[in-house]
């Protein structure tokens, strides 16, 4: 599948980012995976060049499966025809982690951060993302935790949020996916995160009701701001022209 070209106008120019603890929020809405990836890559390049402060990207995907750099294709349990029958895309992802599913009903956040201006420690960054999710879930009465030696957030022995990141020159991309109210049957196409003994769950399965994703986003932003010591501000002056060709390949 070919990605739609993207124009993303850079309008936030900082004289210096080293003393600024601003983090811009960019909500892409529902987009194809390739479209989101183009935006992530462009924002990450701007961050490396210190043209913008940190950025927190939100997106929702149609049904798709991504396989990370450390993943095994054997953890994909469906063939191409089965995926096509159910309208599920498949992509190799330039991130850490194994295989995972994305789709409607997930809260997805991709922080693009320069860890040199926070803490140059990838392990601490991962644990901090987990705590953002754990604290957010606690706000809704869901008691979750991390598991030593495993990445992600868990309720008992079931995973409720997956994390897979990439770092380049200490700038992060990709991020986290929290299961709010997805159709969990789509996880049957894979061995989630390569862990055959673990299952998946969602906030809806635990609470028995649908939670407003906008409220989850609001609470997550509160905890993200506190844990990473960033002032979140909307990136209003961004123009994304999904139809104009030749803007960025």
Segments (PLM) and residue ranges:
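Short, conserved beta-strand/beta-arch hydrophobic-aromatic motifs that form part
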Residues: 73, 79, 160-180
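C-terminal accessory segment of soluble enzyme catalytic cores
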Residues: 185-249
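A short secondary-structure junction signal
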Residues: 70, 120, 164-166, 188-190
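N-terminal lobe of the biotin/lipoate ligase/transferase fold
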Residues: 2-160, 211, 241-249
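A structural signal for short, well-ordered beta-strand segments
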Residues: 109-111, 151, 163-165, 176-180, ...
